[in-house]
Design a protein with these regions (language model features):
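N-terminal helix-rich module
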Residues: 1, 11, 19, 23-57, ...
Length: 147
């Protein structure tokens, strides 16, 4: 028998390659969504901690906001960042649950405290993180959402 591949072997290889190429976009989308989620949570956490530090250092109130209508967030004095479409955001400030049309804000005070509140960032139902701001200390902590 001569060395080489039969037609069936070549077709099997092409079939496997086609299957892998069909799965690649799905895997890429999941990877992109996961990356956007981690980046958004990390940036929110960093900006909230910076807002607290700036309030204490400069001796004046600094506001961190989430605009639910425009799907953006940020702190006073910085350009707002856009929330990716793949993420769902829910905020609770001053005991009021805001999920729709309004802008929520947490104010960091020169004393180190804040008005308190929490921001939940979800990438899929039940998968997410809550950024909680303690009203007394102004400390920002992360909690996994359990549903």
């Amino acid at each position: 028998r001569e060395r080489g591949l039969t037609l069936i072997e070549i077709l099997v290889v092409f079939g496997i390659l086609a299957l892998l190429m069909g799965l690649a976009p799905v895997a890429f989308d999941r990877l992109r969504e996961s990356s956007q989620y981690r980046d958004t949570v990390r940036t929110m956490l960093s900006q909230m901690r910076s807002a607290r530090q700036r309030a204490v250092t400069e001796g004046q109130e600094v506001r961190f906001f989430v605009n639910l209508r425009q799907r953006s967030y940020g702190m006073d004095g910085d350009a707002p960042r856009v929330l990716p479409d793949s993420l769902t955001v829910r905020t609770v400030v001053a005991g009021i649950d805001l999920t729709g049309e309004r802008e929520a804000s947490i104010r960091f005070l020169p004393t180190g405290g804040s008005t308190g509140g929490s921001i939940e960032v979800q990438r899929a139902p039940g998968v997410g993180t809550r950024l909680r701001v303690d009203w007394l200390s102004g400390r920002v902590t992360l909690e996994a959402l359990m549903q």
